[in-house]
UniProtKB/Swiss-Prot annotation:
One of its GO terms (biological process) is endoplasmic reticulum to Golgi vesicle-mediated transport. Residues 359-398 are lumenal. The modification N-acetylmethionine is found at M1. It is found in: Endoplasmic reticulum membrane. Induction: By Pi starvation. It comes from Arabidopsis thaliana. This is SEC12-like protein 1.
Length: 398
């Protein structure tokens, strides 16, 4: 009780997300609840944007920009950043969603609030997601209503008030064709993003609850990963998106997952636990490559997301705030390193050929004539003999 009171008085981080910028620059959006003392608000709810240093794998000490939410909006609940990096949407505790635009450049940025009329009085929205190509926005409410809209004109594709009992999680497929949603009652459904048509309800056993969902993103493996709970055992189910049939399951964490993420290149999948642990597995083998025990000690991880361009992860919790963790996964070759290696191999082959030619007679021990001389060659050119020497050698009358 004392911990809860202290957290309420000092405010807490609600969620966070990466913002992709040009030239592999990444920012971080952190949504923070208001600070309270008794029944009064001592500090308002904030939306902060921090810069990220890939060398030190850390966030800037002070935000690049800050936006203060009005008291009438309440606290932030969830955020979703557009893939283009210029807009993000934030749902609030007093109902409705807010749209924000990032304006500015290297000298400074500003967060501008804009109207989002279709979602202005939509009620409390638990989760939101932009499609991978940025052409659609989906929002899911605690009342079970699912909305899919075109972006940026916000034309309504689907407004289904009875999609679920209460929507818990959602994710778009890599090709932006499908939308997966999960419910607090343990069910999961698949929707056609283009027209909102319900395609399938995922199969599950009688004692199994599907809680979280993420599509594969490597472009070659058309899978849907779902974090599920079967009795007291947490697991990750894998579904084939061509048939929506379960292919199998894998246990990747000891505790129930509170959030899940797949890296932008689709190579890794991560689970954030209700005990504060984080597990990262390679999608190809489904084996654990990184494990952070008690990263957010005793706290359920509220949000978890891979950095778009680095093997770094952003996690948040109400007690410990935001954390940036460098993953202990195998290092990968960068593009310039591959070209450098190919150049070195080419030079090594040229040098080896030259050395072999210089020592070929002694190697094969072939006899040479009394007046015979072996021609000399240059490492980067042809024969070192002049044209006149060649002509005289063959007694040519030119």
């Amino acid at each position: 009780m004392e911990i809860e009171e202290a957290s309420r008085e000092s405010g807490h981080v609600v969620c966070g997300s990466w913002i992709r910028r040009p030239k592999k620059v990444n920012w971080v959006l952190i949504a923070k609840a208001s600070k309270r003392r008794g029944s009064s608000v001592s500090s308002p709810a904030l939306l902060n944007i921090f810069s990220f240093d890939p060398i030190t794998a850390s966030l800037s000490s002070s935000p690049l920009a800050t936006h203060t939410l009005k008291d009438s909006d309440g606290d932030p609940v969830a955020v979703s950043v557009h893939p283009g990096g210029d807009y993000f949407v934030c749902s609030t505790s007093k109902g409705g969603c807010k749209l924000f635009e990032l304006v500015g450049g290297a000298t400074g940025i500003t967060i501008l609030a804009k109207e989002l009329l279709p979602l202005q009085n939509a009620g409390l929205q638990k989760c939101m997601a932009f499609s991978f190509d940025g052409s659609k926005l989906a929002v899911g409410g605690v009342d079970g209503c699912l909305r899919i809209m075109e972006w940026p004109n916000l034309s309504v594709i689907l407004d289904e008030p009875k999609a679920h009992k209460s929507i818990r999680d959602m994710d778009f497929s890599l090709d932006s064709e499908f939308l997966a949603t999960t419910s607090t009652d343990g069910s999961a459904r698949i929707w056609k993003a283009e027209d909102g048509f319900p395609l399938s309800t995922l199969e599950r056993s009688g004692d199994e609850n599907i809680e979280l969902c993420r599509f594969s993103k490597d472009g070659t493996k058309p899978f849907l990963f779902c974090a599920a709970q079967r009795g007291d055992t947490p697991m990750v189910n894998v579904y084939d998106i061509s048939t929506w049939k379960k292919l199998g399951f894998k246990k990747l964490s000891r505790k129930t997952a509170s959030t899940m993420a797949v890296s932008l290149d689709g190579k890794y999948i991560a689970l954030g636990g209700k005990d504060g642990d984080v597990s990262v597995a390679e999608v190809k083998t489904m084996e654990i490559y990184h494990y952070s025990k008690r990263l957010h000690l005793g706290q359920s991880i509220a949000s978890l997301e891979f950095c778009p361009s680095e093997r770094v992860m952003l996690t948040t919790s109400s007690e410990w705030g935001e954390m940036v963790t460098k993953l202990t996964v195998p290092k990968e070759w960068k593009e310039w390193q591959i070209y450098a290696l190919l150049f070195c191999l080419f030079m090594a082959s040229v040098i080896a050929a030259y050395v072999f030619f210089e020592n070929s007679d002694s190697f094969w021990k072939l006899p040479m004539g009394k007046d015979q001389k072996r021609p000399k060659i240059s490492l980067f050119g042809g024969s070192s003999s002049t044209p006149s020497e060649d002509h005289s050698r063959w007694n040519l009358d030119l």
